[in-house]
């Protein structure tokens, strides 16, 4: 099933998944739900008593920010594939989170994958400007290709010639 952005009524769809699984067929959900729509989806899984050991969910667009403030006990065992998790313990990530909390003046605010991507991208841009010796767009663009920068969660991001980063993928529960 596909839904529009911001969809919030998951009762029917989750019921269909539950009914399909009740026929004894191995069932899993591959979720590409984006943003705030994740909250009512996961709440509905809990409302219908769906547990990861019965119908596991693997999501490709949900992070700690979307789940902040949500009772995550019913979500134990479901998985998400993302390039960044705030909970990863590295010296770089710890320093990044500390700086973010000092800037925002709120220790409850989480960091997320887009923030890490911007952090990496800005630092790569700064490296490319230094390498090019100018801020000229064409020169910097050429210098961007092949730039490398250490991720906050370990590993290295690489800027490819298609203007996309190659970064490690993490699986979180």
What are these regions (language model features)?
Residues 1-48, 87-95, 157:
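Extracellular/periplasmic Venus flytrap/periplasmic-binding protein
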Residues 10-14, 115-122, 126:
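Short, amphipathic alpha-helical "lid/cap" segments that border enzyme active or binding sites
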Residues 16-19, 99-102, 146:
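Residues within well-ordered alpha-helical secondary structure of globular protein domains
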Residues 30, 42, 46, 58, ...:
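Generic hydrophobic alpha-helical scaffold/packing signal
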Residues 34-37, 92, 117-121, 167:
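Catalytic-loop motifs flanking and including active-site residues across diverse enzymes
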Residues 102-115, 124-173:
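Segments of small-molecule ligand-sensing domains
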């Amino acid at each position: 099933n596909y839904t529009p952005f911001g969809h919030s009524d998951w009762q029917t769809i989750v019921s269909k998944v539950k009914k399909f699984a009740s026929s004894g067929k191995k069932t899993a959900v591959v979720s590409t739900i984006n943003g705030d729509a994740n909250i009512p989806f996961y709440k509905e899984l809990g409302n219908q008593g769906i547990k990861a050991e019965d119908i596991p969910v693997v999501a490709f667009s949900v992070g700690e920010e979307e789940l902040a403030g949500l009772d995550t006990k019913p979500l134990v065992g479901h998985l998400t594939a993302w390039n960044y998790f705030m909970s990863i313990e590295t010296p770089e990530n710890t320093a990044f989170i500390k700086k973010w909390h000092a800037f925002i003046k709120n220790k409850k605010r989480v960091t997320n994958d887009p923030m890490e991507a911007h952090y990496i991208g800005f630092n790569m841009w700064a490296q490319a400007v230094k390498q090019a010796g100018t801020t000229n767009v064409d020169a910097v663009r050429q210098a961007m290709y092949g730039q490398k920068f250490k991720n906050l969660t370990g590993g290295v991001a690489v800027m490819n010639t298609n203007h996309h980063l190659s970064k490690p993928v993490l699986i979180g529960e």
